[in-house]
Amino acid sequence: MLKKTRFLDPGRVFLAVGFSLCLFSNTVWAQQQGYPNPTTPQPLASGENVQGGVLTPPSLLDLVSSRISEYSRTDLAHGLYFETLDGKPLLETNPDAAYNPASVTKIMTTLAVLERYSPNYRYTTRLSYTGSFDRERQTLVGDLVIESNYDPTLNYDSLFYIAEKLNEAGISTVEGNILVSSGLILNLRKSGVAAGNEILTTLDKARWTKASESAWKYYLQAKAAAKMKIDSTEFRGVTFVSGKVLADDVSQPRKRLMEYHSAPILKVIKVMNAYSNNDMAHLLGRLVGGPSGVQDFMIRRVKLAPGEIRLESTSGLGSNAITPRGTVKLMRYAHNWCEKNRIAMTDLMPIGGVDNGTLADRFKRSDLVGSVVAKTGTLSNVSALAGVMFTKARGPVFFAILERGYPGSMRRLQEEIISLVAADSGGGLGIAYGSEMGMSLVEDARVYILREETSRA
């Protein structure tokens, strides 16, 4: 429950000469804190206390409770828990009540995936072909086969990169069809044959759409920003004579052509969390058994009690539940895991006011920018923020703010709470002022040519 403040008669506080020294010291304190000059009688501000006739600063809880009361009639809609690195509780309101964490769930998925797979794990998309390769005509006489395993990074940039490598391998024409596996996902939306059709209209310039043209321009910009080699600003691509897309029934023998390895999964995770991409979270969740696999990880590894968590999705959509204290356990676990693996928390989550995405325009005040590393969560009547804030006096402070209410208002309240905690902790300590996120994940992808030589005379 919120701490209620008793309003006292101002005459007891500002009596006159006998308390002049006390008045002077508190006047200085009030001015430093931005309170009105108390030289004339006025009611105490919410949270102020009188002890032995001396006006004392309000506690952190008093200040936060006062701000919450400005937004809600009850504190039951607000779950807060802040804890220092040495485990000391700093601030709490309903820490053991269950709230919907929304997209903060993605951090649960993040850690479950990273524990099972190396941070350097890459998705692999394999290209092979049926028939033969006519070197003189730079032509595959047969079908191009594309097999993938639900890679969330495959997009236009990936296809342009693959097309460039096909050209380098001496392939400019395919006389057969495109055969695709069921695990092929493109641009996070289309799968199977639908994805194959978009591959066809991207690799073959004669079939380009306006979307293809725009994507090519963006690809060139991303390569330039990443200082990747640009051999030509003109797209050559691959001509498909037949141009049909079929589901691969794996009935025909095929020869290896090349492999496309995605960016390391750690890079994928940072993008997912920065932009809070639900489709990425669903696909990453497949790697660990979906919601039940992530929930099992939270109970088995993070040591949450079964009653502290309930998951229906790996993205945060739907009716998930966790306590603020349980969320801070997750953040502490993430911190310890990162230290053990020599990875920074900023490799997992965006930096407030620095990285693109959901935190790009938050915590941009000079005393907070670069000091908050966190994950946002938003649903129609849910707003959440959890992560770690770096402070000058207390070092890292783990926190969870899980709230029910209009997200726009709750976001403002969250920033006020973070500001109050930072001020109480000597101020925020910026750890990064420039983003290391690139324009495209393709800059960290790799292509390996593996062609088995079967040439026609």
In which residue ranges do the predicted regions lie?
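A small/polar active-site loop signature that marks catalytic segments
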Residues: 195-348
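Beta-lactamase-like hydrolase cores
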Residues: 31-86, 90-98, 163-169
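Active-site-adjacent, His/Asp/Glu-enriched structural segments that form or flank metal-binding
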Residues: 123-187, 191-196
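Short, well-structured active-site flanking segments
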Residues: 115-130, 342-346
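Active-site SXXK
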Residues: 87, 101-119, 178, 272, ...
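Bacterial N-terminal signal peptides
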Residues: 14-25
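Second-shell loop/turn segments in exported
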Residues: 45-55, 92-101, 144-154, 254-259, ...
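Small-residue-rich helix-loop
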Residues: 90-92, 285-457
